[in-house]
Every structure is written in structure tokens, then in C-alpha cells.
Curated annotation (Swiss-Prot):
Parts of the chain that traverse the membrane: none
Protein name: Purine nucleoside phosphorylase HI_0175
Naturally occurring in which organism (per UniProt): Haemophilus influenzae (strain ATCC 51907 / DSM 11121 / KW20 / Rd)
Keywords: Copper, Hydrolase, Metal-binding, Oxidoreductase, Transferase, Zinc
General function of this protein: Purine nucleoside enzyme that catalyzes the phosphorolysis of adenosine and inosine nucleosides, yielding D-ribose 1-phosphate and the respective free bases, adenine and hypoxanthine. Also catalyzes the phosphorolysis of S-methyl-5'-thioadenosine into adenine and S-methyl-5-thio-alpha-D-ribose 1-phosphate. Also has adenosine deaminase activity.
Molecular functions (GO terms): adenosine deaminase activity; copper ion binding; oxidoreductase activity; S-methyl-5-thioadenosine phosphorylase activity
Length: 244
């Protein structure tokens, strides 16, 4: 069972990774380590996969799985409420596991140079545009220069085609965003979007410059990752972080 481990410089008490599609029990089209229970997969298979997630990767607890809605809502752990509709999760308590699920959208994991705060954010283009990264960072006590971010596997800039409407939504918020869109050479009126670049711009605007990752493409790495845009009916990876 493999995982993608961040290539970042963080304290040794930080545990973080993104799962791949390999090593689970789900059948096609969710082959095989699908962790999403909202995508049409067999519920028993998903339950087994979630148990494997805890056991194989040494999680200190069974995590809360958010009901992700492309919002900017953040939940702070430990959380005793009933409303799990959110797209980011933060904690400053040891062994509280933060998890988001993705299959093209950008997962961003956060920690600090002191290693006593962590967060996980699901940044689809809507949430990214609306400010889900900014809302996550608001929870941190650390100064921006002490916050560290890692971009997990997302759809890459050669595969994420959007219309002019999406371009305009981003540019209204930050004019620099236009640098992250290139006209599609094949289809007129369409653009190729770089989520990693936009997320970097947004974090830089907050004063966060310690940024890692952003070197995978879920769409093109079919053997390793689920991709909603490629397959439509598919599973979800998990991006996970906690501190001891």
C-alpha cells in the first residue's frame, strides 16, 4: 500500500501523506483504495478501506470524514457538532487527524515551523476562488512566515480545461490569476488552468512562502490516482495530517 509523502522540511512530530488508488478492496470503477462513501461504491468495501487507512498508516484515531461541498467552511478538531459540511479541517491538539478527500481537486496540507498546528484543505476551483485557503489560514496562531504548505496530487495544468467564465471569476478576485491560465491550443475559447499556481499566488498574498509539492497530475497518472474529470465515476484519495 503506497502513499505520496510530502517533500517538505517540517518538525519530526508531523505525519502527513496522500493515499493512492492502490491497495484497497473496492472493485472497478473504484479500483481499489477508494475512501469516499458518497460515490456509489459498495459501502462495505469503503468501510474496509477506511479501516485499512487507520491500520496500515498508523493513524492515532479513526478520522472524521467531511461532507465536502466546495465551500469555505472550516471545522476545528476536536469537533462534537453534527454539521460535517465543510472543506477544511484544523487542529492544534495532538493526535487529532485532519483529512480531506479529492479526485482532481487540490488537497493542501498545512503545518508550522513549531509543529503544533495542522490543517487539511480541499480546494476545488470554486473553493479556491472563494477563499477556502484564506479561511483555513485564519485559524492558525503562527505567523504567515512560519506556516508551511504542501500541495498534494491534483489535476495538472496540461489537463484542467475551463471556460472564460472560470478565468473571469479568478481574475476579479486577483488580477495575477490570469497568469495561471493559458489558451487551449486545441479548442478555441477554452483555457488550461494551473491550480497549483493559483494556490501559490493566494498563499503568497497572505505572506506564506514555504510551499512544497504540486508536481503530480491526477488526470494523467491513471495507475496511481483517481480522477473525476477523466473517469467521472471513480473513487477518492485521502490527504491526511496530524502531529504527535
Amino acid at each position: 500500500m503506497q502513499a505520496i509523502n510530502p517533500n517538505w522540511n517540517v518538525p519530526k512530530n508531523i505525519h502527513a501523506f496522500t493515499t493512492t488508488r492502490e491497495g484497497g478492496v473496492s472493485l472497478a470503477p473504484y479500483l481499489s483504495f477508494n475512501l469516499g462513501d458518497h460515490v456509489g461504491d459498495n459501502k462495505s468495501a469503503v468501510k474496509t478501506n477506511r479501516t485499512l487507512l487507520v491500520e496500515k498508516f498508523g493513524l492515532p484515531q479513526t478520522p472524521i470524514f467531511l461532507t465536502q461541498t466546495h465551500s469555505t467552511r472550516v471545522i476545528q478538531l476536536p469537533y462534537s457538532g453534527q454539521n460535517l459540511e465543510a472543506d477544511a479541517v484544523y487542529t492544534n491538539v495532538p493526535n487529532q487527524v485532519c483529512v480531506v478527500m479529492t479526485a482532481d481537486c487540490l488537497p493542501v496540507l498545512f503545518t508550522t515551523t513549531s509543529g503544533n498546528e495542522v490543517a487539511a484543505t480541499h480546494a476545488g476551483w470554486r473553493g479556491l476562488c472563494d477563499g477556502v485557503l484564506e479561511e483555513t489560514v485564519k485559524y492558525f496562531q503562527a505567523k504567515p512566515e512560519d506556516i508551511i504548505a504542501w500541495f498534494g496530487p491534483a489535476i495538472g495544468p496540461k489537463a484542467f480545461q475551463v471556460g472564460i467564465d472560470v478565468v473571469e471569476k479568478f481574475v476579479v478576485v486577483d488580477e495575477k490569476a490570469k497568469l495561471a491560465f493559458q489558451p487551449d491550443a486545441i479548442e478555441e475559447g477554452k483555457y488550461l488552468s494551473n491550480l497549483y499556481q493559483i494556490a501559490t499566488q493566494r498563499l503568497n498574498n497572505l505572506g506564506i512562502t514555504q510551499i512544497y509539492g504540486g508536481n503530480h497530475c491526477t488526470f494523467n497518472e491513471k495507475e496511481k490516482f483517481f480522477s473525476y474529470r477523466r473517469d467521472n465515476q471513480t473513487g477518492r484519495m485521502a490527504s491526511v495530517i496530524w502531529f504527535e
